[in-house]
Amino acid sequence: MPTLVVLAVLLAGLVVFANVWTDVQWYSQLKAAKVFWTQWGWAIALGTLGTLLVGLSAFVNHIVARTGEKTAVRKGIDQYRQQIEAHPWLARLFVPLALGIVFGAQLGSQWRTYVLWLHRTPFGQKDAEFGNDVSFYVFTLPVLQSLLALSVTLLAVGAVVAIVSHYLYGGISSDGSKVVLTSRVRVHFGVLGALAALVVAGFLWLRRYNMLLANNEKFSGASFTDINASLPGITILSLAAVLIAGLFVLAAVKGLWKFTVIGIAVTAVAGLVVTTAIPYFVQRFQVVPNAAEKESTFIQRNINATLAAYGLDNVKKSEYKAQTDAAAGQLRSDAETTAQLRVLDPNIISPTFTQLQRNRPYYSFDQQLSVDRYTIKGTPRDTVISVRELNLNGLSEGQRTWVNDHTVYTHGFGVVSAYGNTTTSDGEPSFFQQGIPSTGELGKYEPRVYFGKSSPDYSVVGAPKGTTPWELDYPTGGSKNGVKSTTYAGDGGPKIGNAFSKLMFAIKFRDTDLFFSDRVTKDSQILYDRDPRVRVSKVAPYLTLDSRVYPAVVDMDGNPKTPKRLVWILDGYTTTNQYPYSARQSLNEATADAKSKGAGQYGESPEQVNYIRNSVKAVVDAYDGSVKLYQWDKKDPIVNAWSKVFPGTLTPMSKMSGDLMSHMRYPEDMFKVQRTLLSRYHVTNAKEFYSGGDFWDVPQEPTAPKGSTQDQPPYYLTLQMPGQDKAQFSLSTGFILGGADKQNVMTGFLAVDSEAGSEPGKVRNGYGQLRLIELPRDVTVPGPGQAENNFLTDSKVSTTLNLLKQGGTQVIMGNLLTLPIGGGLLYVQPVYVQASKTSGSTSYPIAQYVLTTFGKGSKIGFAPTLEESLNQTFGGDSGAQAGDANVSGHKEAPSADSNKQQAESESQCFAEPERLSFGFA
């Protein structure tokens, strides 16, 4: 049995060593070893310190008790004392060390708290009550709380050891009717009591500051009752606890325990009065009858702090007197916006990309494609883009061997991108970059995708020079076996060429084939942790990552002679929940909508935050997996502190190429959090805020299934907001009336300038500017839900769509876009049709119609193109040209006379392929 235990311990140690050693290799390959060693160095150092302090507390209290008076021999007790004396190392070393490990080592898990405090930087903003810089609450207060919690552990462990030791050595005894303590024991306990009282005083003193971080029913931060009733009482109690500490010392020296007991009793009763009774009466009889007036000062503090903490203190607000009548030529001044109006829905057309561009079953595209912009032939264009990633699930069961999974099928290939504002005449995406090999308007770039969101868990790549390539590169008709092979030539993973490395990685992945396979050569590398989010979160463990990762083909070095790179771009946030008076918000709740499908943030983040900054833009190369962290926010004190903790890991934004800069955008999750807060905090008057009468809601997704309460997602598109000089790539959302009734009436519209510019190392002026337009209360402007209802209840639209459905065709309503143009609000929605799923894998959605409406009294536009639909809505001529103006559909737009006949024709058109497909099957 002992042999088995030893073997088990050795095996466990080997596994731990293998995991640590391989992690070191991974970080070293990324030139980020300092991140690994800094994390573990601080964690081990603090864990060791906590262990030693707790162990020392146990040791000192035992020694103090041991040197006390010894009583006469007590049957049944002295035998234990004799055992301890016979093995002094047990009590003096082993027990304290064991207690230290159990209760003290956890201090290592708080390494972030301590390193941030050591490298803290000021916020330059003071709290409204005590005048402390915000950095005190973010960096210092957590350390003080941690130290007090550690003190409680030290005293608790010390007290338990003291009681046990005094009992064993006779300092504590019983004569049958009462417990007898020697004078030395009373002194010992008096000192411990004094220290405990000081710790309580410390907790009470810090509680004063924690009031500013509290959540109240109506707002966050300290309230009138907190400041005027609870705060004075807690301050008095804290001072009283210091006096009690003095009484404990007096009792220890003079033996006057009566005064100590009286002091504790009086303080306990006073504590109930000043922390419970007085605040209750103040709240009930002073605040409740006059709440708006009494709380206004504190609500205003909450409003100001929340706007500052969430980057909402510079929102440009304006009133927008929206028209509801549409007239010919009304969009003439908005031609730039309508030209880029997106009719391709990135959340619907993934199956279309898959059917038309996948090429082989072992490739796949993301379920939600990305919206970006590229300059094509000198013209900026909104685009929809996705990466053709490797998907091993597309292989047959017979193809799923270790060799294939880990050495042959190693990477995806290229991007596919289509114009966002137009389609082909058949309703399919109009691709400008496509195919294998990748061809199109993006120029020459490295198309191989070794690092992506769906890459295999690990691949072994690389081979000696002259070896026949065995990695499948891409399918081609020009070779004997129909594929072109390649050998990885990058530096993307740790070397795995020698026996020791193979053994370590075989243990890590629990895979013996890694050790024995001949495909693992002296020139091999192992690629793992290939998801861009995983790589960034390991290199920057302090960041919360946006739920969206998007690809871009970018000139990284600014040299047009070198090939571009395919990269993944991620937005990183620094957050805290320690900003005084700022409202707390759950990131997962604020960012959940109909598009997120449960995807949340990745990385380090508290459950709720009350401060957030998009401090870092991360870029991961899809070929070699290299990670670059660009410091996007130079003023954020939290990221500045982390840059001192991990020096050299952040790249100044000034080193970003112009082409990469042009693909930076305002982060989606940040915007969602801000819109959630602005639904309430657009009200900046404290008394109006208290009433809540003008609070808004985010509209629910109008295309979601009945009964769903999912929020409508914000959308990236090019638009010109009222007061803006020209149309810019933006992220936008609407607001509707708040309250339990959920009236779908538009009350506001928020957009943020998401155009970072294309100047190397410099963000364009205007990027990140939030613009909020508020609609007049005396005009009823339909919200997204009303607009969707108007579309579906229009006789022409409903007849056509119902007939299509009867013919076996699935009708899919695309994203409902809202645009404040033409002096009102324009709604645009593409309509997709898809053959029934019973027709097999050839079923995919194509854009068939575009719906438009402007105000509650306007005509519904319903046509194969946006151009025609806008003209229908605006009296035959909208005055502007849409991006699909030159597209002619393969059937005419439905008219009042031909609507039924047209729909029946389309129904047959889609039903027949279904029958043919079934027949051939």
Where are these regions (language model features)?
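Soluble extracytoplasmic regions of secretory-pathway and membrane proteins
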Residues: 3-920
